Amino acid sequence: MMASFQRSNSHDKVRRIVAEEGRTARNLIAWSVPLESKDDDGKPKCQTGGKSKRTIQGTHKTTKQSTAVDCKITSSTTGDKHFDKSPTKTRHPRKIDLRARYWAFLFDNLRRAVDEIYVTCESDQSVVECKEVLMMLDNYVRDFKALIDWIQLQEKLEKTDAQSRPTSLAWEVKKMSPGRHVIPSPSTDRINVTSNARRSLNFGGSTGTVPAPRLAPTGVSWADKVKAHHTGSTASSEITPAQSCPPMTVQKASRKNERKDAEGWETVQRGRPIRSRSTAVMPKVSLATEATRSKDDSDKENVCLLPDESIQKGQFVGDGTSNTIESHPKDSLHSCDHPLAEKTQFTVSTLDDVKNSGSIRDNYVRTSEISAVHIDTECVSVMLQAGTPPLQVNEEKFPAEKARIENEMDPSDISNSMAEVLAKKEELADRLEKANEEAIASAIAEEEQLTREIEAEENNDINIETDNDSDFSASMGSGSVSFCGMSMDWNDVLADYEARESWRQNTSWGDIVEEEPARPPGHGIHMHEKLSSPSRKRTIAESKKKHEEKQMKAQQLREKLREEKTLKLQKLLEREKDVRKWKEELLDQRRRMMEEKLLHAEFKREVQLQAIVKKAQEEEAKVNEIAFINTLEAQNKRHDVLSKLKEYEQRLNELQEERQRRQEEKQARDEAVQERKRALEAERQARVEELLMKRKEQEARIEQQRQEKEKAREDAARERARDREERLAALTAAQQEAMEELQKKIQLKHDESIRRHMEQIEQRKEKAAELSSGRHANTDYAPKLTPYERKKQCSLCNVLISSEVYLFSHVKGRKHQQAVRENTSIQGRELSDEEVEHLSLKKYIIDIVVESTAPAEALKDGEERQKNKKKAKKIKARMNFRAKEYESLMETKNSGSDSPYKAKLQRLAKDLLKQVQVQDSGSWANNKVSALDRTLGEITRILEKENVADQIAFQAAGGLTALEHILQAVVPATNVNTVLRIPPKSLCNAINVYNLTCNNCSENCSDVLFSNKITFLMDLLIHQLTVYVPDENNTILGRNTNKQVFEGLTTGLLKVSAVVLGCLIANRPDGNCQPATPKIPTQEMKNKPSQGDPFNNRVQDLISYVVNMGLIDKLCACFLSVQGPVDENPKMAIFLQHAAGLLHAMCTLCFAVTGRSYSIFDNNRQDPTGLTAALQATDLAGVLHMLYCVLFHGTILDPSTASPKENYTQNTIQVAIQSLRFFNSFAALHLPAFQSIVGAEGLSLAFRHMASSLLGHCSQVSCESLLHEVIVCVGYFTVNHPDNQVIVQSGRHPTVLQKLCQLPFQYFSDPRLIKVLFPSLIAACYNNHQNKIILEQEMSCVLLATFIQDLAQTPGQAENQPYQPKGKCLGSQDYLELANRFPQQAWEEARQFFLKKEKK
């Protein structure tokens, strides 16, 4: 009695909890029902057994989850773990991470596919393939837009009330690929997955359930055949077969409309509720519309997948309705694991796959509590036709099984699984009770629905249109009907599936891929163009015939539909009778279920109590399982680390092998070079020995001839001596008398001569005292160009004299000597040159005591600088605006590069930016500086290979921008003692990387110009020069220059600037074709309509900006600060070399873009950049002064014995070459300015000494490049300039002109070298008879006349040369042409001049 009371009390507590918690408590999957506590918040508590949870987790791992299902599983799993573990140990699974990773995986696959298609099209160079890809992408864009409209329509449909909501909705969302890709070899777990919309019996208004994971439909699988069989089986109970397809649309809509009910459980909201047969209202829709809808649904992914071994609970496919089919209690066991609650008026449930829940089901079967009753889909149709509900079978078998279980099982032997089974049985009983009540209501509604359907069918009119869409819809609808009505046997389906599965397991992946249908590139676009071709249009007769055929088919279809309508009415009447009978059976069934529930309650309580005992034992099993999972994950991580280590070691081995191979190749090359050197040395020794032998023989012959001549001369001398003695003896007497008479006159003249001699000695002493150097005023020797500490002035000519060179040049000048002779005369005769020089030094050359003009000049210079800076700001603003337009234009272009180091360069560029951005404003730490140097070193090693692709890849990755950020550290320095944030060594490395990026890379140099990065380099260069070279008056320019300016940073900036401008010169686009220059922006065309192409505009702005910022003055100060040789100072030599190279590049670019004609001798000279004026004001930026000091200030010369040094080191030679190239480029830019500057007093003397010394060096040491530059420069100096022609033939012998005539014989025989020498000789001697006489002493002038005549007669030389396009740069060989070194209009006169014989 007490036991009965306790059970009764327990039963009352359970009932009270059930009454308070609702249907959520009845759906619990737990070990026990907590009797003492419950949640106050009203939320459900759901406890799940260990095996059940593990089954759910296994199912989640073995199935591909959609994003919507992920959210549902998260909420369900969280609820389960809330009761299994303590609150402190609760760990929520991060399903959102899985969803994000799955989404990233999809987009990664999409990106890879697009990249592969792009690479294929690019490699094939096929426009057809590109068009086909564009066509497919447009179609996919349309599909996704249609999907957006579909989702919006679904949301709108949910918000509408039930009365105004349509009964069905067919929507074609995805037209491009209605079926998913067929998985070639799916695993067993992936095949046995539940259907897309899993259904379960709903015993309440909103039951909290967990949606089962689902796979996307995989084409036409075995589950599709089951679906086809199911629809074919149920077709007999339907009114028309065509109504079996529209519910698929509802299933499609249900996947995307999910929400949570009032109790916090996630539910799937259908597109519209699936109403029962008695409550759903059928609209008045034509049969043609239903057929079209069935066709649309057949193309979508709305096919429900059914597991091969799951129990078919009963799914009645009709026009938006479903039949209620109760199943055996055993069938609900697994439905509690993964149920899917559907917010509908009527629900059914299906089971999970047998293989997915095999562990639970095997446990259930071992206990032998309940035997499973499988209801095939054929039974559903039989029950519907016979009117026998399946619940009768359940009611007959359940009491017998229950009694057998009660007799066989003892309460002490009940296992944990048995308690779970009994709990689920009670839950199923409650659900069946609810389902029975709903089924009764559904039967009543079904009856009413059938009545309305009969009335609607009787009032429905048949309306068949004959257009193409209706005909296509009808044809597709009939095909869908035939498919849905097809009959298939379940055994056939299983046999076919097993055959296909065995074939998949025995076939390799490659064979499966090869059996995929091939898709030739371009086939799609070809077929699209072929099908859309205008030639496929029908003629009027064909269209009329086609229309008549459609009319006939439509008439036949109308008759067919009328017959189907009659048949449908008959079936509806029969079904109405069946439904009424079914309603009566359901009422009887409800009574039997109540009796069965009372019998089962007592047994269930006993089982539930036994289950509590086993709960603790399962905890250890769960802990072991978690430990096993953690161990497995650790092993997987270890395996990944080992595989990465193996790949790393393999890569190191490959690099070592490559390094060893390169070392061997280098050693082989060195050995080959040494072998060639030994062979050349042996040949040279042989030639030397041969020459020595010949020289000895020649000396022996000469010595023998000399001895013979000497003997004959001695004999003749003795004979002449005897004759002379005899004649002298005869004349001695007569001469003695004459000598005595003349002795007095001679004595008088001798005294006068001694007096004049003493005066001359006194004058020379005075002159020596006047000269600071104490050197004789003979211009045959090179005087010093060092500025005087106190400047001198010629009071007669009012000329300022700054150095000894200017003094000698002025005193020897024609104007000064003429002025002295006009102002002074001695005894009516003209003064000699020595007298004029002596008088000038003694009387007219005076020291300047106070330089009164200095303040005024300084003020004027300051105002000029301010004006230039304002102009430079305007130019920079214009350049920045154009740079922004260029960058916006280049953003649309994808600069691709096939560099093998592209990824590495991108990473290194990002590292540079990161290191600069992370660092604060203070000085960098040593570790950060080391990291920066390592990064720059890696970039340097890659770019030193001089691969253009690597250079472009580094620029595209933002490398130049990162280098600019690094170099910004120089800007804050305002004086020499300022400590930089980044060490100078690192800055020099950055400059070196910048240089390597732009060296011989026209693309990068063009980008530096057009993106205005060149302005940053120039500003940085001017800033460095400003720090080390203070602003000075022109009179003392260069005296206060800090020697630190010649260090590496400033030199690197000069080198980079020269490299960029030089590359722009070498790769400058022509006027007709400009591949490297982007199209000129519209705004720029409006601002400067008269200007040339963008390249010319940008270069003009750049040169104008540099000139106005004072770069020329700063460089001039640096050049003037050099007062000695650079042999022992290589840093200074490199600085001077790159500075002269920068000036050379600026002159060459200015010549190319100023827009004047190609001829150098054109008088229409316009230089809007101001470069010519700046160089003219600074005497060629002091380069000639620097070169003179480098060449001559390193020697101590004795006026009587010493001669200038003519052997120079390589550093000096390179400085001389760059300086002469600058002279020649400036001469090409503005020849009169060059001749006037170099031909002025002082510089003309320095130029003559410099040219003579360099020619002497080239005569001793072979240096062709230097010799050619000197020859060309002398030609530009003397062409059409009589005063300069006199300079080259003056001085000590051999003069400059004589040295040109004494060049090796190859310069008079080799056509290539003749082209170099002869134009300079013609320029130096034309219309100068004295120079021509000197020339004729060394060579024949006929050679020059013949040279001119040959060039004049050469086809194309005389005619085409003057008509070169404007703005073209002089090439490496163009400046050697005669037309560019001597005016063409004077060729004939020059030829006549050199053919004319001079009178001796």
From Swiss-Prot:
GO molecular function terms attached to this record: nucleic acid binding; zinc ion binding
- The protein in question is named S phase cyclin A-associated protein in the endoplasmic reticulum
Gene from which the chain derives: SCAPER
Polar residues compositional bias: what residue ranges? 231-243
Lineage of producing organism: Eukaryota, Metazoa, Chordata, Craniata, Vertebrata
Name the source's superkingdom.
Answer: Eukaryota
Q: Which species does this protein come from?
A: Homo sapiens
Q: Which residues form the signal peptide?
A: none
Segments of this protein annotated with the region Disordered: 36-61, 226-277, 517-550, 701-723
Q: Biological process GO annotation list?
A: antral ovarian follicle growth; retina development in camera-type eye; seminiferous tubule development; spermatogenesis
